[in-house]
């Protein structure tokens, strides 16, 4: 890591590092989507995954933990969007069940780390209100 990069707090945050992995995973998967999805689901999934990293980075540069916590909450929401899009991509036949599960597992790591970071930044809060990201197994 370069000397100047060490000044970026977000590089040391596990949630940002996991977000970066998610972005690479999403980028690899959407390459095989049909061309007609280029400005639809392909673009949306990439933007949502990128938003995880962007919001953690932006929040880490803020002057207060309260402000940072707000950006962590937005990053959490962006990760949830990726989870939703994983189901839609699977429903359309763009990804396999195994690929969907890989995306959901990556999102689960991010929301867990985001929730922990949120609690650390905002001790008075009990954490981001987290509902299950996974649908009941009755209808995959």
Language-model-derived ranges and their functions:
Residues 1-140:
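Amphipathic alpha-helical assembly/interaction segments
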